[in-house]
């Protein structure tokens, strides 16, 4: 439970504390060990020193708990008639990666393909104080596997949409929201309002819909010519956009993906103000002039991580002087040339 105890109805260990409020070990572990010994199921006991996860806020030990969540099934047929690239989200994504999208550099294809090929279902829900709500209702007494567990009603959806367009997502959290959206359609007392929020990557992954498709100045087919971001977005924006578009449009939301590396210091370390290894473009141009910075960019391979620092800039400045002196000599030698 939320207080660090087993549920009261759990046989043998109901109500026992795994962790106490002060973060100290409760009586649950010792009770489990004693029960295992009692039934002859304990192979060995002892103490070992090992790392253990702690909260970054409170610094107290944490407990991993299984909690009910909402998922998007990547291997379940979507049944929307958009089967040109496959019947499931995974099939559509993998086919789009191979047949529809151009990857720059080509290695980007392998990264996203391997991730989607091996990924589990997408966990859509989060339990947070604020965010984009899932905006759904579940029927009391039904189980998740039942057809009527999730309320599917176009009139209810229209009411929610209208409220959000005027009041924003806060409309979902107002007092009486359930009665407002359900009254006159179904009995509000028969349903539970879900207050889970969406994964933020679902939020960012929907940009193809409201930037490209649902605007007068969007693209004709709702697809982007190019998505451009850093290499970390194979796991992020490229990934979530692909899954969501394959679930709603039947194919990728983009025709091309260009991936760039990151700018690091000259030792290959991530820049950090606390470490003091940042390089300001303004400082570079003040010391060397803009052409040195332009030349560093021009001679760098953007498809991999870029390094910059005092010694590297000195080398670029030397190259620039050689180029300038050589070109000056060549231009001077052209006098009276015909």
Predicted regions, residues:
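Conserved nucleotide- and phosphate/pyrophosphate-binding catalytic cores
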Residues: 335-338
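Residue patterns forming the tRNA-binding/recognition surfaces of aminoacyl-tRNA synthetases
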Residues: 1-144, 149, 269, 275-319, ...
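Alpha-helical recognition segments enriched in aromatics with Gly/Pro capping
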Residues: 1-4, 128-130, 151-305
């Amino acid at each position: 439970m939320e207080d660090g105890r087993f549920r009261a109805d759990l046989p043998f260990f109901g109500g026992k504390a795994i962790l106490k409020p002060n973060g100290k070990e409760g009586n649950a572990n010792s009770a489990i060990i004693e029960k295992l010994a009692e039934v002859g199921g304990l192979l060995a006991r002892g103490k070992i020193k090992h790392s253990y996860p702690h909260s970054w806020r409170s610094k107290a030990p944490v407990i991993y708990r299984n909690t009910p969540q909402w998922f998007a099934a990547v291997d379940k047929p979507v049944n929307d008639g958009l089967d040109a690239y496959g019947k499931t989200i995974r099939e559509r994504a993998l086919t789009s990666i191979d047949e529809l999208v151009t990857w720059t550099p080509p290695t980007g294809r392998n990264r996203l393909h391997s991730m989607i090929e091996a990924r589990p279902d997408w966990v859509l829900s989060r339990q947070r104080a604020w965010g984009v709500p899932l905006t759904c209702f579940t029927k009391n007494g039904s189980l998740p596997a039942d057809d009527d567990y999730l309320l599917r009603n176009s009139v209810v959806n229209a009411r929610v949409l209208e409220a959000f367009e005027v009041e924003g997502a806060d409309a979902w959290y107002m007092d009486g929201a359930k009665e407002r959206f359900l009254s006159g359609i179904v009995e509000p007392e028969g349903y539970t309002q879900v207050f889970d929020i969406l994964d933020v990557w679902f939020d960012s992954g929907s940009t193809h819909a409201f930037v490209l498709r649902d605007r007068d100045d969007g693209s004709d087919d709702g697809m982007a010519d190019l998505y451009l971001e850093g290499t970390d977005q194979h796991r992020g924006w490229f990934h979530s956009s692909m899954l969501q578009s394959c679930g709603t449009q039947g194919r990728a939301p983009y025709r091309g993906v260009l991936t760039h590396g990151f700018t690091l210091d000259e030792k290959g370390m991530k820049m950090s103000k606390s470490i003091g290894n940042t390089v300001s473009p303004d400082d570079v141009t003040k010391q060397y002039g803009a052409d040195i910075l332009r030349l560093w960019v021009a001679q760098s391979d953007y498809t991999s991580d870029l390094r910059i620092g005092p010694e590297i800039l000195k080398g670029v400045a030397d190259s620039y002087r050689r180029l300038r002196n050589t070109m000056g000599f060549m231009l001077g030698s052209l006098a009276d040339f015909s």
